[in-house]
């Protein structure tokens, strides 16, 4: 008799993520993303929604993921939003190290927190 073994597929959380990686991880986590954009496109986003915004220089291949939920901005480095992003609230808590590579997953954690109306980031406030 043959025994069938089912293997659960996992999606590893990577530090450096692409927009495609973030969409896949969001789907697995049940996080709704209205759109992923680069900073130049962020000024034209509707006021309400769940967005991930890539901050990067014009001649750069790499950047830093941030997010916006309605009028609240999140940056895992605790930096206020660039002037093109109109938000009334933003975080000032730094969740990742200066050279950390997990800004994309942190953005998803923020959006999940807002969409489920639970402060899941609170556990990370004082880990020092």
Protein language model features and the residues they cover:
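Cysteine protease catalytic domains with a Cys-His-Asp triad
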Residues: 1-66
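Secondary-structure junction/capping motif
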Residues: 17-18, 103, 119
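Alpha-helix initiation/capping motif
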Residues: 18, 38-41, 81-85, 126
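Short, solvent-exposed coil/turn linker segments
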Residues: 35-42, 75, 115, 119
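Cysteine protease-like catalytic core of ubiquitin/ubiquitin-like
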Residues: 47-114
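Catalytic-core signature of thiol
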Residues: 95, 113-128
């Amino acid at each position: 008799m043959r025994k069938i073994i089912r293997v659960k597929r996992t999606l590893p959380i990577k530090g450096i993520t692409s927009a495609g990686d973030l969409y896949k991880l969001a789907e697995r986590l049940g996080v709704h993303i209205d759109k992923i954009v680069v900073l130049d496109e962020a000024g034209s986003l509707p006021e309400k929604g769940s967005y991930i915004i890539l901050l990067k220089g014009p001649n750069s291949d790499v950047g830093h993921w941030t997010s916006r939920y309605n009028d609240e901005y999140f940056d895992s480095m605790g930096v206020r939003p660039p002037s093109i992003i109109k938000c009334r609230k933003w975080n000032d808590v730094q969740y990742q190290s200066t050279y950390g590579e997990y800004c994309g997953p942190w953005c998803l954690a923020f959006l999940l927190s807002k969409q489920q109306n639970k402060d899941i980031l609170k556990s990370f406030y004082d880990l020092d």
